Amino acid sequence: MALTVFAAPMASAQSCAKQAASLQEKQAEAQTLAEARLTLVDEVEAAGDAWENAEAMRNFGEEQAIEADTTKTAYDALKADLFEKESSLQLLVATLNDNVKAYNQRCVTD
């Protein structure tokens, strides 16, 4: 009986240590994703500016119209990538917050 009483807290401590390590990994992953998202925001803004500039020149000739279409396609693709990254980041952070809450309830004592 004494062995069971001693083993339970030790197993719980190991579980909490694993949870803490997992939380740190997820936090690093979220930080990396957030940084990639910020970089992509700058790229989307630059692509949007390029498209606006090209669109203003559309009616000056066929080459300008092709350039406007090309820059619009690139801009739309970057916006889609940004939306995907933003969605992934929000999901990851929501999951991380839930995991932190569970960790705090189970492993953190006052």
Where are these predicted regions, by residue range?
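Short, solvent-exposed mixed-charge patches
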Residues: 14, 109-110
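Immediate post-signal-peptide N-terminus of mature secreted/exported proteins
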Residues: 11-60
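A generic alpha-helix preference that emphasizes hydrophobic side chains
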Residues: 8-10, 100
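Alpha-helical interaction segments
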Residues: 41, 65, 92-94
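Amphipathic alpha-helical coiled-coil segments
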Residues: 30-37, 70-107
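Flexible coil/linker segments and helix-coil junctions enriched in charged and small residues
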Residues: 53-74
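Bacterial N-terminal signal peptides
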Residues: 1-6
